[in-house]
């Protein structure tokens, strides 16, 4: 028995030793696993940090490359301009020495020579100072910010600079045909032009090195108004006004004199084009009565080269307590929403009646959020969250907001059924309002900076948003969660959803690029930027994008003062990639908003220059300019349907002058004028 007991004890000891060894091995394995996991996580995080660093380095290199490219392009343009000036000066000197021996002109020049020395070579040197005047000061009237004075006062104050700057196109136009002729014909034409130059009697002709500021304007006859402006890319968009020096009745009457008011067919996509002269002169007093419509509160200037078949009229002016940052119509066009400081207003379009004023009293000063904040949504079935609303009579349903800080509503958007209104603000929140109860039913959180743009999907169950945090987010409104996040290199300023099924979303950003994604997969399908092969992209930040009504194109507006129409034929397989079809040049300051009419016949654009331009979509010609605000036109929107009757189209504008305005437009003699426009275009 003792041997059996001893064997049993020995077995137990061995089992205990095995158990202990197993426990030690398990503990060691767990320790190794934890250590390996830590090492693995550390290496992963380190590699992610390195990748992010590489990414940032690439972005910085790209930005540096763009800046260097812009600098080189500007330098090249400047050098080209200097070479052209030198060539013209040399040609003029050579021509002057030849023409100076002509017997018929010697007595005429000798009368003005006096103590001026060899004055017979002075007239050929006149173009050089005039061209330099255009480069030096001709840019100033358009680059400077608009002040609060009336446009007529600005024109009068800048008359001195414009008078000298207006002469450059004349010289260019006279000299360009000579470069295309054989030498003998050039000499004959030069002699003919020299004999046609009137000799001034108001002041003696100065030597080549003298001051010509006072003598040059007197040596150009009034009939030598420019008929076409051709300048290098660096100065093409800053051509000075010419209409200010012309008499009120000197509007062009024939097609030859009106060519510079129209865009040639082969230059529609070109970025650098001169601004049509009628857009440069904001003094409506100098415009013939048949080319303008003027009231105490606004005026309209028509393109002299096109029939005045469009009529624009102010319907309602809606006063606000602060800057109007955004305006948006409902899908049926019956209501208009406006966003300003802390409040969103909804108006009845037909009457201008205030239907609701929405504000969230719980909103406070925007606070920074953690980098890894979870994207969530808050819902509310009552008004206990501090939101307030007013009915059409202006009576508040709850206490007024006590917040002292500004909180501008940057974007508003109606749901397709018109029952809800989405608002985006500086506090990084998206609020969904029930317009019947005037309460917040959902709050979408996740953006880390100001929200600048919103757009509903046609189905109404999704919403896209763009923010300064460099992301575009798609929200599922059935669950209140973010279903897709798209990140780019710079802040997002504007977003839009394609019509129909909402298959694509477009976004504009501070990096001068328009991107188009597939809304289902998040794949980037088009990138429309200034680095394309043709160089037809935007040269500055893109502040507004909108799809055309047929969904086949995108319209964009930029701080480079241009509007562009991009076709999306590449998405349908017709072409390998999208391209710029038309560049609309006419604004004198930043383009802040763009919109299209229902049939895509017209494009509307609002600008910091306080104007709204109507563009013919296909030709790129500006049809008219509306000046109806005393500050920047921040937002433009066009209504669907005909809320003011079948004969009127309706659009609205929001401005920094604390006003939102509803306008109506109509066409007069549509069939007759459309035929005339077609003939002019052809």
Swiss-Prot record:
Domain of life from the UniProt record: Eukaryota
InterPro entries, per database record: G-protein_beta_WD-40_rep, Tscrpt_rep_Tup1_N, WD40/YVTN_repeat-like_dom_sf, WD40_repeat_CS, WD40_repeat_dom_sf, WD40_rpt
Ranges for region Disordered: 97-257, 359-400
WD repeats: 319-359, 404-443, 446-485, 487-527, 537-576, 586-625, 628-673
Record carries keyword Transcription regulation: yes
UniProt key word Transmembrane helix: no
Keywords in alphabetical order: Repeat, Repressor, Transcription, Transcription regulation, WD repeat
UniProt-listed Pfam families: Tup_N (PF08581), WD40 (PF00400)
Segments of skewed composition (Polar residues): 145-160, 374-400
Comp. bias regions, Low complexity: 114-123, 172-194, 221-255
SUPFAM superfamilies: WD40 repeat-like
Role noted for this protein: Represses transcription by RNA polymerase II.
Similarity-based family: Belongs to the WD repeat TUP1 family.
PANTHER family: F-BOX AND WD REPEAT DOMAIN CONTAINING 7 (PTHR19848:SF8), WD40 REPEAT PROTEIN (PTHR19848)
Protein name: General transcriptional corepressor TUP1
């Amino acid at each position: 028995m003792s041997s059996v007991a001893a064997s049993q004890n020995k077995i137990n000891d061995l089992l205990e030793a095995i158990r202990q060894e197993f426990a030690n091995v398990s503990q060691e394995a767990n320790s190794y696993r934890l250590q390996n996991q830590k090492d693995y996580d550390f290496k992963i995080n380190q590699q992610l940090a390195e990748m992010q660093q590489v990414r940032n380095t690439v972005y910085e290199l790209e930005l540096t490359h763009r800046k260097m490219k812009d600098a080189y392009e500007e330098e090249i343009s400047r050098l080209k301009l200097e070479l052209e000036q030198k060539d013209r000066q040399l040609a003029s000197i050579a021509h002057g020495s030849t023409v100076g021996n002509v017997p018929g002109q010697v007595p005429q020049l000798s009368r003005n020579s006096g103590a001026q020395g060899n004055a017979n070579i002075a007239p050929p040197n006149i173009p050089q100072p005039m061209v330099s005047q255009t480069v030096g000061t001709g840019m100033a009237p358009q680059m400077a910010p608009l002040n609060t004075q009336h446009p007529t006062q600005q024109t009068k104050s800048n008359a001195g600079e414009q008078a000298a700057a207006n002469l450059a196109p004349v010289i260019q136009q006279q000299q360009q045909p000579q470069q295309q002729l054989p030498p003998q014909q050039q000499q004959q034409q030069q002699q003919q032009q020299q004999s046609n130059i009137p000799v001034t009697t108001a002041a003696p002709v100065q030597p080549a090195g003298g001051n010509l500021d006072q003598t040059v304007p007197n040596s150009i006859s009034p009939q030598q108004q420019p008929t076409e402006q051709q300048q290098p890319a660096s100065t093409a968009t800053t051509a000075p006004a010419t209409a200010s020096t012309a008499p009120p009745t000197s509007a062009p009457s024939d097609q030859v004199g009106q060519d510079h008011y129209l865009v040639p067919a082969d230059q529609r996509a070109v970025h650098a084009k001169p601004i049509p002269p009628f857009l440069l002169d904001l003094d409506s007093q100098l415009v013939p009565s048949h080319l303008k419509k003027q009231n105490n509160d606004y005026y309209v200037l028509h393109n002299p080269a096109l029939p005045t078949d469009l009529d624009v009229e102010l319907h309602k002016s809606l006063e606000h307590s602060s800057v109007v940052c955004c305006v948006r119509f409902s899908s049926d066009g019956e209501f208009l929403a406006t966003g300003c400081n802390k409040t969103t207003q909804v108006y009845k379009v037909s009457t201008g009646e205030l239907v609701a004023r929405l504000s969230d009293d719980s909103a406070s000063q925007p606070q920074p959020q953690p980098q890894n904040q979870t994207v969530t949504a808050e819902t509310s079935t009552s008004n206990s969250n501090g939101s307030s609303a007013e009915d059409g009579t202006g009576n508040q349903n709850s206490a007024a907001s006590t917040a002292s800080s500004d909180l501008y509503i940057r974007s508003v958007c109606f749901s397709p059924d018109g029952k809800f209104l989405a608002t985006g603000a500086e506090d990084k929140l998206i609020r969904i309002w029930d317009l019947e109860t005037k309460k917040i039913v959902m709050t979408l959180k996740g953006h880390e900076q100001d929200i600048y743009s919103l757009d509903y999907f046609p189905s109404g169950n999704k919403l896209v948003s763009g923010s300064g945090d460099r992301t575009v987010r798609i929200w599922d409104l059935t669950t209140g969660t973010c279903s897709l996040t798209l990140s780019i290199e710079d802040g997002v300023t504007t977003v839009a959803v394609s019509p129909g099924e909402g298959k694509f979303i477009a976004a504009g950003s501070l990096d001068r690029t328009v991107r188009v994604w597939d809304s289902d997969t998040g794949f980037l399908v088009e990138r429309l930027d200034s680095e394309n092969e043709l160089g037809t992209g935007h040269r500055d930040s893109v502040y507004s994008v909108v799809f055309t009504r047929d969904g086949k194109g995108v319209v964009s507006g930029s701080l480079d003062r241009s509007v562009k129409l991009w076709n999306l034929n590449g998405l349908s397989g017709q072409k390998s990639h999208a391209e710029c079809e038309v560049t609309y040049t006419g604004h004198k300051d930043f383009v802040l908003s763009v919109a299209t009419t229902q049939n895509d016949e017209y494009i509307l654009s609002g600008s910091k220059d306080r104007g709204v331009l109507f563009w013919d979509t296909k030709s790129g010609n500006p049809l008219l300019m509306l000046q109806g605000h005393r500050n920047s036109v921040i937002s433009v929107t066009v209504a669907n349907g005909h809320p003011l009757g079948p004969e009127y189209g309706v659009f609205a504008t929001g401005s920094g002058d604390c006003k939102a305005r509803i306008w109506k437009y109509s066409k007069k003699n549509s069939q007759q004028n459309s035929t005339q426009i077609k003939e002019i275009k052809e």
